[in-house]
Curated annotation (Swiss-Prot):
Subunit structure and binding partners: Homodimer. Heterotetramer of two MnmE and two MnmG subunits.
GO CC term, one of those recorded: cytosol
Keyword set, alphabetical order: Cytoplasm, FAD, Flavoprotein, NAD, tRNA processing
Gene: mnmG
One Pfam family from the record: GIDA
Function of the molecule: NAD-binding protein involved in the addition of a carboxymethylaminomethyl (cmnm) group at the wobble position (U34) of certain tRNAs, forming tRNA-cmnm(5)s(2)U34.
Subcellular location(s) per record: Cytoplasm
Protein name: tRNA uridine 5-carboxymethylaminomethyl modification enzyme MnmG
Cross-referenced PANTHER family: GLUCOSE INHIBITED DIVISION PROTEIN A, PROTEIN MTO1 HOMOLOG, MITOCHONDRIAL
Binding site for FAD: G10, G11, G12, H13, A14, G15
Sequence similarity: Belongs to the MnmG family.
GO molecular function, one term: flavin adenine dinucleotide binding
GO annotation, biological process: tRNA methylation; tRNA wobble uridine modification
SMART domains in UniProt: GIDA_assoc_3
Species for this entry: Novosphingobium aromaticivorans (strain ATCC 700278 / DSM 12444 / CCUG 56034 / CIP 105152 / NBRC 16084 / F199)
Amino acid sequence: MQQFDIIVVGGGHAGVEAAAVAARMGARTALVSFDPQTIGAMSCNPAIGGLGKGHLVREVDALDGLIARAADASAIHYRMLNRSKGSAVQGPRVQADRKRFKAAIQKMIAAQPDLHVVGGEVAALRLEQGRVTGVDLADGTALAGRAVVLCTGTFLGGRLFRGEERMDGGRIGEDSAHRLAAQLRDAELPMARLKTGTPPRIDGRTIDWARLPEQPSDDDPWTMSPLTPARPLPQVFCAIARTNARTHEIIRGGLDRSPLFTGAIGAQGPRYCPSIEDKIHRFGDRDGHQVFLEPEGLDDFTVYPNGVSTSLPTDVQVAMIRSMEGLEQAVITVPGYAVEYDHIDPRALRRSLEVKAIPGLYCAGQINGTTGYEEAAAQGLIAGMHAAAHVLGRAMPELDRANSYMAVMIDDLTLHGVSEPYRMLTARAEYRLRLRANNAASRLTPIGLAIGCIGDERRKWFEDRSQARSRLETALAQPATPTELNRAGIPVRADGARRSLMEWLRFPEVTLDGLRDWIGNEPFDPLLVEEVEEDAAYAPYLARQDAELRDLRASDAVPLGDGFPFADVPGLSREMVERLERAQPDSLAAAGRIAGITPAALASLLVHARRRASAAVVA
């Protein structure tokens, strides 16, 4: 029997990050995939990033993950969403060449020491005394492991729907994992079903592009990862089509054959990526919906029509697509479909993403009730880090809602659970001024260095950057008066106040380039300059949050632990006890984020938790 420290099940976006980070930390790791040739495949849209999602990509990258570098290696269209708003809510997004993205992931996986790819279906978990000890493959092969990370995506009990058609599978043309799903249900883990969908693919040669408005790539040469020196591929434009009254009429006429409306699909789909049937049913008064036509590659004629995810019958899909201007002659190469799949209630997980009831078993990605490549990648990274840290005996630095979107997502999942596929949004983060996409390295790379998941190239880059930042901050500590700035051609109001140059950067008239008389002519990295200028601009707001943040971290340090006796806490009403027992918060801070928990209930919890801790010390 082959022996591993970590076994990762599934080669999607969660699986590759989990396996890669565990191997980077020095754990002997197996990545098990149905078909190794599909590792890193983009199952749905050929894009990475977006609002909230782009923050996750940058955070995974800051911990030396794969997704951002693969996105840059395959990007054929860059667009910064929300560019007109503050940087805290801007969303970097790239359109990727689907084949090149997968190739980039597979190249990094193949080059990673201590990472071994195994082809096959995981049919069962190996368990001893309630703890996971490895996996059994469908061909009879057994793999021993000290921890297992499940990253099954939509393959866990997956079933595909298109009109009246029904097929087993997690993705078109690929099998689903029914035996593993049955074992998890038999273990009495809390499970449910969710659904997602994908639009039809179109042959781009049959689109009349000249009649459609173009959406070009951004001119300024930003990249997803700071380790990418320049964009390696030529850029293409996307185009925008639009549904119309005729389109809506066709869709309504096909609803009686849609599995969403016949009752064949009972699971809830993603709120922020609804099917076109659902859009027309819910928003029938609108005169049209945008459809973004996104090329899937430089040497691939396939186009992804973003905005028309559907499980309507193929003939209805053809009529729907051809009803739109510019698409009258469009040829569908692969019809759209919906997929329904099993997921675990994420409230059954610790914040490490370890299953509470089965020590050594971790879950990441859509199995936890999320949707999206970026959410999956972030969970895979966190689960892999925690699994490797546990196996290798390392202390895991704490991530919390004030230092990462990843922690916001995991806290939301493990505390509140899901009733629909969870998507990251900037609005979910209370401390989003601290969690900008462009400062992810400053926030998280030191944590990665502490846990040992950062490679040599990023370590050298970060050390050089930290030294440059130190030099810049030293220069910006110099004081200056309004008169001195005016003499340098900077038109600030002459209020007589003497401020540090860092404080002066809060004023809109002052830029770092304008302060060259003080800081010299060192050519600082533009991304570092942008980050420092924004740190200065946001400083007053961040200072106001400091007291709140201290309270958060202090209450996070009051553990409640598994099996906390909420019913024994004096002063808690029956309603409070029921809410707490349902959510099973692991700290006082987590209890405070449960809907309906009152300040009085938290005060009672605090007193009881401290008494228990004191009694445990005495004992």
